[in-house]
């Protein structure tokens, strides 16, 4: 049988230790058993990748809900308001519109007024 050098053992141990370190905070054998930790970390990374994509969708829908809630008292729906903005040549993204609606309501009302004016032309 061939002799196994200690260097290979060190490399293997370091690799396994890396996976165990990534599994810190997991429950049960998923944090201590190499095989279970490795499987769970791979799965967790996949969920994290998906989550980063979903976060963008979630925030966009949140901004739309906020804009819609701010525009309804002015007598417009979200879609007609956005159409009015296009007609008025106002290029403000949804994130900024929702921030204006929450933090700077007077300025937002001015924008709504301009959108209404563009719709009536």
Curated annotation (Swiss-Prot):
One GO biological process term: translation
Keywords: Ribonucleoprotein, Ribosomal protein, RNA-binding, rRNA-binding
GO molecular function per UniProt: rRNA binding; structural constituent of ribosome
Pfam families given in the database record: Ribosomal_L20
Protein name: Large ribosomal subunit protein bL20
Biological role: Binds directly to 23S ribosomal RNA and is necessary for the in vitro assembly process of the 50S ribosomal subunit. It is not involved in the protein synthesizing functions of that subunit.
Keyword Ribosomal protein (UniProt): yes
Source organism per UniProt: Mycoplasma mycoides subsp. mycoides SC (strain CCUG 32753 / NCTC 10114 / PG1)
Top-level taxon in the UniProt lineage: Bacteria
Family, per entry: Belongs to the bacterial ribosomal protein bL20 family.
Gene Ontology CC, one term: ribonucleoprotein complex
């Amino acid at each position: 049988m061939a002799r196994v050098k200690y260097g290979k053992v060190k490399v293997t141990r370091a690799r396994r230790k890396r996976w165990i370190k990534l599994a810190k905070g997991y429950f049960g054998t998923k944090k201590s058993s190499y095989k279970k930790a490795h499987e769970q970390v791979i799965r967790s990374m996949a969920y994290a990748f998906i989550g980063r994509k979903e976060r963008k969708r979630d925030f966009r829908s949140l901004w739309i809900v906020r804009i819609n809630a701010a525009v309804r008292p002015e007598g417009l729906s979200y879609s007609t308001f956005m159409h009015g903005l296009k007609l008025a040549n106002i290029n403000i993204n949804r994130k900024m519109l929702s921030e204006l609606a929450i933090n700077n309501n007077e300025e937002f009302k001015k924008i709504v007024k301009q959108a209404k004016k563009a719709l009536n032309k």
